[in-house]
Amino acid sequence: MLISVLKSKISYATVTGKDLFYVGSITIDSEIMKQANIIENEKVQVVNLNNGERLETYVIKGEPNSKTIALNGPAARRCEIGDQLFIISYAQVDPTRENIKPKLVDLKTGD
């Protein structure tokens, strides 16, 4: 049996762009992705602190050090530029093994 546990969390990511007519996904600055141990095409849950919306999508690598956080496709309707997001990924693990330590990145404090 496997269970889902928190693997990575980017807190207080500010939406910098949105592209309704793109095929889908969330674009994240590749340096932020590296800090959070999130890879391209990884499934993530996106939680919008401004309106309570939650959605699942996959990650596209953005330009390094651009601070890009952009929702694309239909997900663009669920945010506004300037909204604050939590971006969360999970891992499937065997509960009888040692727990993984999640990678937490807080963009508000820089941690």
Swiss-Prot record:
Primary localisation category: cytoplasm
Assembly behavior: Heterooctamer of four alpha and four beta subunits.
A Pfam family hit: Asp_decarbox
Keyword Lyase carried by entry: yes
Catalytic activity, reaction form: L-aspartate + H(+) = beta-alanine + CO2
Protein name, per record: Aspartate 1-decarboxylase
A single BP term in Gene Ontology: pantothenate biosynthetic process
